[in-house]
Regions:
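Active-site or pore-adjacent capping/gating segments
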Residues: 1-37, 292
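Gly-rich Lys/Arg/Thr-decorated short loops/hinges at beta-loop-alpha junctions or inter-strand turns
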Residues: 12-24, 67-75, 250-266, 306
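Loop/turn elements at helix/coil->beta-strand transitions in domains of secreted/extracellular proteins
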Residues: 39, 58-61, 96-99, 243-248, ...
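Short amphipathic alpha-helices and their capping/turn segments at secondary-structure boundaries
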Residues: 41-58, 231-247
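Solvent-exposed loop/turn segments at secondary-structure junctions
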Residues: 68-71, 105-108, 254-258, 295-300, ...
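Glycine- and acidic-residue-enriched helix-capping/strand-helix junction motifs
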Residues: 69-94, 260-273
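Lectin-like carbohydrate-binding module/patch detector with strong preference for beta-trefoil
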Residues: 103-245, 250, 262
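Catalytic cores of nucleophile-dependent amide-cleaving enzymes
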Residues: 271-319
Length: 320
């Protein structure tokens, strides 16, 4: 292959065999990336002239809702983008005004032994008088992530020193701005208990337990009961955001390193249950809804095909 590409040629016969740093993130490269982004969009359904959107629509007439509306997720084999543009950001650039947005995700607090759980200065999860609020996101098949509203960082079970300064193995901390690694330790499972509490387990199903230094999840032991209280209902907030709007854009999809890559096989092609619930409620309240699906793996969309007039799909990971 290298011979055919001209890598060993004395003369630069192949214009693509000597890429330099000057070619990285150049204006030409950015234009190519933008072109690829445009061409990757696939129209799956379009009835009653739902698309393209009416250019006369004002920003105040539009609502964007859904967990992928203002999120940007890197694919496992994708490059590190020099900048990131979310769907919401792109739409606001087009309209030159802010657009109503709701991610549809619950906000929750955790309590244990009569105390709240909060992120300490070093990022570790500790007992506190006032609990921190976390954004709860369900990715299907039992996989949750929890992001601190206050710090913007994800809870995770520390796996190595790369995740903090000499961390304790398995210590629960919020010290990463994205859930992205070979083993995504920001994944948690929630096991309801008979008394209404829950036991949290990490991605390997090791329960979260507590000792004098904080909370850990590194071995098969008895998990500590934790109360998880919803302090803001994400779906109801999204429903309120779409009432009376002329156009709703519902952004659903995946984080491609959660639930599907080399060491993980999905058991279903359905959207995560909470995304399906959001779709049901939004379609019921405002039928002028277009599904914008951001995904790097396939989904069955029977419910969306039945309830919504239009569906478009794009992969994740492009900077534009």
């Amino acid at each position: 292959t290298k011979l055919r590409l001209g890598v060993y040629d004395r003369e630069n016969l192949n214009p693509y065999d000597r890429v330099t740093e000057d070619d990285i993130d150049s204006p030409k490269a950015r234009e190519i990336c933008k072109e690829l982004s445009r061409e990757s969009i696939v129209l799956l359904k379009n009835e009653n002239g739902a698309l393209p959107l009416d250019k006369a629509l004002k920003a105040e007439d539009i609502a964007i809702v859904g967990p992928l509306g203002d999120a940007w997720y890197q694919d496992w084999y994708g490059g590190t983008a020099p900048y990131r543009t979310t769907f919401l950001q792109g739409m606001e650039v087009l309209k030159q005004e802010n657009i109503t947005f709701a991610d549809g995700l619950d906000r929750v607090v955790f309590r244990c032994d009569g105390k709240g759980l909060a992120v300490a200065e070093d990022g570790t999860l500790q007992m506190a008088d006032e609990p921190d609020v976390f954004i709860k996101e369900y990715w299907g098949e039992g996989s949750y992530t929890f992001k601190s509203v206050r710090t913007g960082k994800y809870l995770g079970a520390r796996l190595s020193e790369s995740q903090g300064e000499k961390p304790k193995m398995g210590q629960i901390a919020a010290d990463r701005e994205e859930a992205f690694d070979w083993f995504v330790m920001e994944i948690f499972h929630v096991e309801p208990q008979e008394d209404g509490s829950v036991v949290l387990t990490n991605r390997f199903h090791y329960p979260v337990y507590k000792d004098a230094e904080g909370f850990f999840s590194f071995e098969q032991t008895e998990g500590i009961p934790i109360t998880m209280e919803v302090v803001e209902n994400g779906i109801e907030k999204a429903v309120a955001a779409v009432r009376g709007k002329k156009q709703v854009l519902l952004a659903l999809g995946c984080n491609s390193v959660i639930n599907a890559k080399e060491e993980i096989d999905r058991n279903t092609l359905e959207l995560p249950e909470e995304q399906e619930m959001l779709l049901d409620r939004i379609a019921e309240v405002n039928p002028n809804t277009v599904l914008v699906l951001f995904t790097n793996y396939p989904y069955t969309l029977q419910k969306a095909m039945e309830k919504l007039p239009a569906i478009i799909m794009s992969a994740t990971g492009s900077q534009d």
